[in-house]
């Protein structure tokens, strides 16, 4: 399995070599500014680009399969790409500019995190996600929802592995479409003036980050952003959430 630091440097190199106007965002930015390193408990590496400058196809071309990256299936309305390689994931987020603000859209299952039924929805989401995407078993059973949830995953993972091998790409797309017939669009939103960028040196390479990263992080994580929270749940605790309800159109 590739190390997170190596994947980060490799991804930055790909973006820099192709002159992509990107910036580091979300949990990856938090680790760089607060911890002076990538967060060891973070599941992915977060980059952002402007939606009006690049299409998903533009980014997929530079993270092509011959570089070892595989795209996870996702909803058309999601303004992001999830690129998996050797058990790790790189997320490319496409931010939309709208007057004096900018926002990103992700599709999530509707429901209350405090509801006793919500974990059943999460389990359902896990099953669909595992079946339609090339998620490794180790990554799949890793859970942020406690030991009981992890145990349930371990009990059902073997039949899911067998079933996944039998499914065609067409069936996988139909599965994903039907499972997300109604969903909620949620993401982060920022004042546009906070998304101005500068170059810094990190891990011996040049990277692009917001000019005022502390303000961006405070806007996202709150006044206590400097206090580590390994079990942070963005959909519950994010301070700058953007919400929109839509129905599915297409699968990519």
Model features per residue range: what roles?
Residues 23, 41, 224-225, 234:
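Tryptophan-centered motif/residue detector
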Residues 1-12, 16, 64-114, 121-130, ...:
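Conserved catalytic core of two-metal-ion nucleotidyltransferases
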Residues 12-45:
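Active-site nucleotide-donor binding segment shared across nucleotidyl transfer reactions
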Residues 30, 55, 98-100:
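Surface-exposed, flexible loop/turn segments at secondary-structure boundaries
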Residues 31, 48-50, 208:
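General alpha-helical segment detector with a strong preference for membrane-spanning helices
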Residues 36-57, 204:
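Catalytic metal-binding acidic patch
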Residues 48, 53-73:
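Active-site surface patch of divalent metal-dependent phosphodiester/phosphate bond hydrolases
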């Amino acid at each position: 399995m590739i190390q997170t630091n190596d994947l980060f440097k490799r991804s930055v190199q790909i973006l820099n070599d192709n002159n992509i106007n990107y910036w580091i965002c979300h949990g990856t930015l938090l680790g760089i500014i607060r911890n002076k390193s990538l967060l060891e408990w973070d599941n992915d590496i977060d980059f952002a680009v402007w939606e009006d400058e690049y299409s998903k196809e533009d980014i997929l071309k530079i993270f092509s399969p011959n570089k070892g990256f595989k795209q996870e299936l996702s909803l058309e309305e999601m303004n992001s790409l999830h690129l998996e390689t050797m058990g790790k994931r790189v997320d490319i987020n496409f931010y939309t500019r709208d007057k004096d603000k900018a926002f990103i859209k992700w599709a999530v299952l509707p429901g209350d995190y405090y509801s006793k039924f919500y974990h059943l929805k999460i389990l359902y989401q896990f099953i669909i996600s595992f079946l339609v995407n090339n998620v490794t078993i180790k990554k799949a059973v890793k859970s942020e929802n406690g030991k009981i949830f992890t145990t349930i995953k371990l009990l059902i993972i073997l039949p899911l592995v067998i079933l996944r091998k039998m499914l065609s790409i067409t069936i996988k797309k139909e599965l994903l479409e039907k499972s997300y017939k109604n969903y909620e669009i949620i993401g982060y939103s920022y004042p546009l003036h906070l998304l101005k960028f500068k170059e810094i040196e990190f891990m011996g390479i040049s990277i692009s980050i917001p000019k005022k990263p502390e303000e961006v992080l405070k806007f996202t994580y709150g006044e206590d952003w400097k206090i580590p929270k390994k079990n942070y749940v963005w959909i519950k605790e994010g301070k700058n959430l953007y919400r929109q309800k839509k129905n599915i159109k297409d699968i990519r």
